[in-house]
């Protein structure tokens, strides 16, 4: 029997003590520049709380992540010379990783001055079930729904 891989524990971030925020900072980070990524995320959180009359930015962030995270996705499997898109349930760790990735990508594609402003705008849109990252989640769910007939091929 194979032994399960043990993952390195990530402590919470230093402002909120939240592991999810620490993982999000790591997802935003480019070229190992963690201080820059931390500043971007915390600036985005301060912009969110300013625009929402002092409402807790962490709650808006959590709501946005839960709105973006996909429940099902399609995976390719080759069966008898044909490749099928098989709908599969997404593990919780992958759900959050996909949410972080989509949030970063679609915030970067937005127009705006700084990455912090773009990230804040995308987070607020996602919390309200709008924005490009929520569209991406809906698109993934539609693909899974369209290929429901191949669910019996699960691996």
UniProtKB/Swiss-Prot annotation:
Keywords: Ribonucleoprotein, Ribosomal protein, RNA-binding, rRNA-binding, tRNA-binding
Pfam families: Ribosomal_S7
UniProt-listed InterPro entries: Ribosomal_uS7, Ribosomal_uS7_bac/org-type, Ribosomal_uS7_dom, Ribosomal_uS7_dom_sf
Gene Ontology BP, a term: translation
GO cellular component, one term: small ribosomal subunit
Domain of life from the UniProt record: Bacteria
One MF term in the entry's GO annotations: rRNA binding
Family per record: Belongs to the universal ribosomal protein uS7 family.
Protein purpose: One of the primary rRNA binding proteins, it binds directly to 16S rRNA where it nucleates assembly of the head domain of the 30S subunit. Is located at the subunit interface close to the decoding center, probably blocks exit of the E-site tRNA.
Assembly: Part of the 30S ribosomal subunit. Contacts proteins S9 and S11.
PANTHER family on file: RIBOSOMAL PROTEIN S7 (PTHR11205)
Name of the protein described by the UniProt record: Small ribosomal subunit protein uS7
Source organism of the structure: Chlorobium chlorochromatii (strain CaD3)
Name of encoding gene: rpsG
């Amino acid at each position: 029997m194979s032994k399960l891989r043990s993952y390195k524990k990530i402590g919470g971030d230093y402002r909120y003590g939240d592991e999810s925020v620490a993982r999000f900072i790591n997802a935003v980070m480019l070229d190992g520049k963690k201080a820059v990524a931390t500043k971007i995320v915390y600036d985005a959180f301060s912009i969110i709380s300013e625009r929402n009359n002092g409402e807790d930015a962490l709650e808006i962030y959590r709501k946005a992540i839960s709105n973006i995270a996909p429940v099902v996705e399609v995976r390719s499997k080759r069966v008898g010379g044909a490749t099928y898109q098989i709908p599969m349930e997404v593990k919780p760790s992958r759900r959050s990783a996909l949410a972080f990735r989509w949030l970063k990508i679609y915030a970067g594609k937005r127009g705006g001055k700084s990455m912090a402003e773009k990230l804040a705008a995308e987070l607020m849109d996602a919390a309200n079930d709008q924005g490009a990252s929520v569209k991406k989640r809906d698109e993934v769910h539609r693909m899974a729904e369209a290929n429901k007939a191949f669910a019996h091929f699960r691996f």
